[in-house]
Swiss-Prot record:
PROSITE patterns: BTB (PS50097). This is Putative BTB/POZ domain-containing protein L834. Residues 16-86 form the BTB domain. Belongs to the mimivirus BTB/WD family. It comes from Acanthamoeba polyphaga mimivirus (APMV). CDD domains: BTB_POZ_ZBTB_KLHL-like.
Length: 262
């Protein structure tokens, strides 16, 4: 199927068989659509056009949480990606609400980077209630909870989860700040001391860099160890410190980033 042609039919108002009026608390807007596309894409519309009186109607009115967001969702049924308003916290939250209203899948990834102002926190709680309260969503709440927010408004269960998650995050942060990593090349009798704890992706890219420029060999044996921040490396004198290579790797990463943006 040519999805570009399908979307063009929507834009040109060709062969449509239903006018969908989307109304919310502020206003109403209309979109011409095709029942077969709506039914195939969304269980809400499938039931609407098969089980209820709307199945024989060419114009229907639906009261929705946000008319603009639902319009964008319908356009998405035509495989046209609408650029989400990633900097609009209200749009991000309403997208979850509207997808839930239509019976579409929702998950925490949809709001993982959302930052809401004070007036948006109550809506954030309602949205997360739809998604579910687990580590990721509790973390989103912790990141957004206002400094002077009256936590007594929240349920005891949610407060317990926030408290437990905060303790875990603080513990992980404390452990990260109090540890240091060593990469030991036992084949070359060299070691590298990292100034902070890096994720495994960084370590892998660094090893690829070292092998790419023939400093190390991909057949060498590497060992990654984590030690307390005040740990003094007791490496035998035959082991040499080549931590200066981190500076070259940093330059390499910056150059790589510039090339990707050009």
């Amino acid at each position: 199927m040519d999805h570009n042609k399908l979307y063009q039919l929507l834009i040109d108002d060709k062969f449509f068989d239903v006018v969908v009026e989307l109304t919310d608390e502020e206003d109403v807007l209309s979109i011409n659509a095709h029942k077969i596309i709506l039914c195939a894409s969304c269980e809400y519309f499938e039931k609407l056009f098969t089980l209820f009186r709307e199945k024989n109607q060419s114009k229907i009115t639906i009261k929705v949480p946000n008319r603009y967001v639902v319009r964008d969702i319908i356009i998405g049924f035509y495989k046209k990606n609408i650029q989400p308003c990633i900097n609009n916290w209200k749009y991000q939250l309403d997208l979850v609400v509207c997808r839930d209203f239509l019976g579409l899948k929702i998950n925490s990834d949809m709001i993982k980077n959302v930052i809401v102002p004070l007036e948006g926190f109550e809506l954030l709680i309602k949205v997360i209630d739809l998604i579910g309260f687990f580590d990721e969503t509790i973390g989103i709440i912790i990141r957004n909870i206002p400094k002077d927010y009256d936590k007594s408004i929240l349920s005891d269960e949610l407060l317990d989860k926030i408290t437990n998650r905060t303790e875990v995050l603080n513990k992980n942060m404390s452990e990260t700040e109090s540890t240091i990593q060593f990469i030991v090349n036992s084949s070359k009798y060299q070691y590298i001391k990292l100034e902070m704890s890096h994720k495994i992706k960084y370590i892998q890219e660094f090893l690829e860099f070292m092998c790419k420029y023939d400093v190390w060999d991909n057949k060498d044996k590497f060992l990654l160890t984590v030690k307390p921040i005040d740990y003094k490396c007791p490496c035998p004198t035959k082991y040499s410190d080549v931590s200066f290579m981190i500076k070259f790797f940093t330059i390499y990463l910056e150059a790589k980033k510039v090339n990707l943006t050009n």
